[in-house]
Amino acid sequence: MVILGIDPGLARVGYGLIEVNNQRQVKMLDCGIIKTNKNQYEGERMVEIAKDLRVLIRKWKPGLAAVEKFFFYKSSTTISVVQARGVLIMTLARFKVPIVEFPPMQIKLAVAGSGHAKKDEVLEAVMRELRLKVPPRPDDAADALAIALTGLFQQ
């Protein structure tokens, strides 16, 4: 089964795709970011996110999507990120991709063994689990792989 991990954002959406076989062996298929143009109107940026996510869904046909659950912080970008997350959830639902959601502490706990793990500890755990020699970049893509692994581990 293919699992798509998503780290929501407006400027950059991290994505990570992993595949697990019947023997529960896991490998990375792809990872990267959906980047939007900060000079565009928010609505146009949302359209770009949905369009690029559709391309990923059609190419990889994920059987599950794992999405980081957003918590409110006092920030001017909060509303925009929540809206972008809504676009992501809607697009996944339109393609009938089952969705699971995890808060950051649960992702850290599932992947690195501690809900308070530091970013580099999570990255090391992702690299170990996926047998990667080079760290996935950018950070949003690495985070998305951790989210995808959490989707696998929580099944």
From Swiss-Prot:
The active site is at 7, 68, 140. This is Crossover junction endodeoxyribonuclease RuvC. InterPro entries: RNaseH-like_sf, RNaseH_sf, X-over_junc_endoDNase_Mg_BS, X-over_junc_endoDNase_RuvC. Keywords: Cytoplasm, DNA damage, DNA recombination, DNA repair, DNA-binding, Endonuclease, Hydrolase, Magnesium, Metal-binding, Nuclease. PANTHER family: CROSSOVER JUNCTION ENDODEOXYRIBONUCLEASE RUVC. It comes from the Bacteria. Its cofactor is Mg(2+). GO terms for biological process: DNA recombination; DNA repair. The lineage of its organism: Bacteria, Bacillati, Cyanobacteriota, Cyanophyceae, Synechococcales. Its main location: cytoplasm. The keyword Protease does not apply. The gene is ruvC. Its EC number is 3.1.21.10. It is found in: Cytoplasm. GO terms for molecular function: crossover junction DNA endonuclease activity; DNA binding; magnesium ion binding. One of its GO terms (cellular component) is Holliday junction resolvase complex. Mg(2+) 2 binds at residue 68. It holds the Pfam family RuvC. The keyword Hydrolase applies. SUPFAM superfamilies: Ribonuclease H-like.
